[in-house]
Amino acid sequence: MQLPVMPPVSPMLAKSVTAIPPDASYEPKWDGFRSICFRDGDQVELGSRNERPMTRYFPELVAAIRAELPHRCVIDGEIIIATDHGLDFEALQQRIHPAESRVRMLADRTPASFIAFDLLALGDDDYTGRPFSERRAALVDAVTGSGADADLSIHVTPATTDMATAQRWFSEFEGAGLDGVIAKPPHITYQPDKRVMFKIKHLRTADCVVAGYRVHKSGSDAIGSLLLGLYQEDGQLASVGVIGAFPMAERRRLLTELQPLVTSFDDHPWNWAAHVAGQRTPRKNEFSRWNVGKDLSFVPLRPERVVEVRYDRMEGARFRHTAQFNRWRPDRDPRSCSYAQLERPLTVSLSDIVPGLR
């Protein structure tokens, strides 16, 4: 492989801001695996955020890249799995598997797509020193997937310079599993590993029941994370996520403070967790290739404490990302902490965002 920009390359990053900034090019924020695609003839490499190749996990994308992208190019984008119900990040995580037979099976069962949003090289030309406005125009010209062909696996992300349109995308596209809006100043060059773009994500709060804790990796004298629950319509307490960003002094204080609430699994709403795969974990599918060797066992607590947390969005019945501590809510009845309090976005079809994407 001999390209003007050679792997590995760390992708250009975005800093979080609270509002959509003016005078930028706006794109939907896709929720998948960030990947820089390198193609030199039949040679294809899919890089990752940590610069480790993901090529072997997505054979269907390698074939699509050879069929749909220019003969020699380097393109920044996102690997996603699109379904009739929106993006499926959990299915995407399952694609990272050591067994080639399973990789092939999942490539057929849950094929991935590639959303292109920046151009680093084309032919013999290095585009990283050119302004984004020029890179974007060349990207649209270069990628065949910018059309509405449902048989294509490579697509160019939509973009606009209109703030009102960007605000509408921010409000509506969450219903398809997207993650907010990215704003790119039109003059910026491609700057690997630099936060020169802007990301605007949703921010919400929820009152959750503290149902357990995990000890800190440094030892058993501190809390690692608190396990959160919400009550379902049938009265069962469901696992909804975790919070874990506490100063070490607070982690130790919490461990002492929560000891009176420690209970046995027999008396806990997640009493089945002690018997699943020999591990005490509130999620049957919590183990994955991403956390091999990580202890996910937990100490059960009587569900009597309520905490207000910040979160961006839901994926199914759980917080998509780790929630953030806001404050304790001693005034709240734990039984009142249900899914009914959560804002539910309107459902949007992915094909309404990118024609041909399903």
From Swiss-Prot:
Entry keyword annotation includes Membrane: no
Catalytic activity: ATP + (deoxyribonucleotide)n-3'-hydroxyl + 5'-phospho-(deoxyribonucleotide)m = (deoxyribonucleotide)n+m + AMP + diphosphate
GO BP field: DNA recombination; DNA repair
Keyword ATP-binding: yes
Family matches, as InterPro entries: Adenylation_LigC-like (IPR044119), ATP-dep_DNA_ligase (IPR050191), DNA_ligase_ATP-dep_C (IPR012309), DNA_ligase_ATP-dep_cent (IPR012310), NA-bd_OB-fold (IPR012340), OBF_LigC-like (IPR044117)
Record's keyword terms, sorted: ATP-binding, Ligase, Nucleotide-binding
Residue numbers annotated as active site: 29 (n6-amp-lysine intermediate)
Enzyme class: ligase
GO terms for MF: ATP binding; DNA ligase (ATP) activity
EC number: 6.5.1.1
Mutant phenotype after disruption: Not essential for growth (in strain Erdman).
Cofactor(s) needed by this chain: a divalent metal cation
Domain of life: Bacteria
Family listed: Belongs to the ATP-dependent DNA ligase family.
Function: DNA ligase that seals nicks in double-stranded DNA during DNA replication, DNA recombination and DNA repair.
Name used for this protein in its record: DNA ligase C
Organism this protein belongs to: Mycobacterium tuberculosis (strain ATCC 25618 / H37Rv)
Phylogenetic placement of the source organism: Bacteria, Bacillati, Actinomycetota, Actinomycetes, Mycobacteriales
This protein's encoding gene: ligC
